[in-house]
């Protein structure tokens, strides 16, 4: 179920979603404590915090993606961990909406699975990786932060999240895994090896560097061009 956020959902709506989910055996995607207004309205109208309200309606769990969680307090973070709920961090969206900085580093240290996303603010995951790396260093005033956590979010945790919701092995090149691959046109100015490739991705690559995209074994983009649709026709219609 794709839901917006606690502050736009009535108890009746949450109850209907909860009951329907039982029949469909599915999870939820919902924005959680993105801005202070979400928490403030929940406390004012329901006398509990956002994560507590979602737990009350059995919205949280292994199949649920809680987006943002910027203003979730310590108790709410404990609930997220206990229920196995996944969190997705969207740094550029948070900056653009001026809602604060995600406690993603803390959530990861706590044992919560945190993925990296965009919330529609961009479609360039290389860019999201760069911003995530910088924003936590700045916010926590620690230049050593995020070197490991951000690649973990993008390359390990996003894969885990995909495997929770879709059948198959994702985000890794091995026999039996889903054949999703991108080829990047990148000529490194300094040596690139197994110990520094994350830095090359972070500082040298960008979305427009993608030359080829293969999805489930099918080539959809080659030489930077979409193969299966007419871009000019779609642009003219739109």
Q: Would you name each region that the model predicts?
A:
Residues 38, 75, 124-126, 135, ...:
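Active-site-proximal flexible loops/turns
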Residues 154-238:
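Active-site microenvironment of metallo-dependent hydrolases
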Residues 72, 93, 135, 187, ...:
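Short, solvent-exposed coil/turn elements at secondary-structure transition points
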Residues 56-63, 105-188, 205:
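His/Asp/Glu-enriched, well-ordered alpha-helical/loop segment
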Residues 1-123, 142-145:
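Active-site core of metal-dependent hydrolases
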């Amino acid at each position: 179920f794709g839901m917006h956020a606690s502050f736009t959902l009535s108890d009746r709506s949450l109850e209907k979603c909860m009951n329907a989910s039982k029949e469909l055996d599915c999870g939820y995607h919902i924005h959680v404590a993105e801005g202070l207004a979400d928490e403030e309205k929940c406390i004012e109208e329901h006398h509990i915090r956002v994560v507590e309200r979602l737990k009350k309606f059995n919205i949280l769990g292994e199949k649920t993606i809680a987006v943002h969680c910027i203003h979730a307090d310590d108790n709410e973070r404990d609930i997220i961990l206990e229920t196995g709920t996944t969190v997705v961090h969207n740094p550029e969206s948070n900056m653009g909406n001026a809602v604060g900085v995600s406690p993603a580093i803390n959530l990861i240290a706590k044992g919560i699975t945190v993925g990296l996303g965009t919330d529609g603010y961009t479609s360039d995951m290389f860019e999201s990786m760069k911003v995530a790396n910088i924003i936590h260093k700045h916010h926590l005033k620690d230049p050593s932060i995020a070197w490991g956590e951000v690649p973990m979010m993008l390359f390990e945790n996003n894969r885990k999240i995909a495997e929770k919701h879709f059948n198959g092995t994702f985000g890794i090149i091995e026999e039996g895994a889903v054949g999703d691959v991108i080829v990047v046109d990148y000529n490194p100015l300094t040596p690139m090896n197994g110990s520094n490739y994350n830095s090359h991705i972070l500082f040298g690559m960008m979305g427009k560097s993608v030359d080829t995209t293969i999805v489930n074994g099918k080539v959809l983009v080659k030489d930077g061009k979409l193969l299966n649709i007419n871009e000019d026709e779609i642009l003219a219609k739109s």
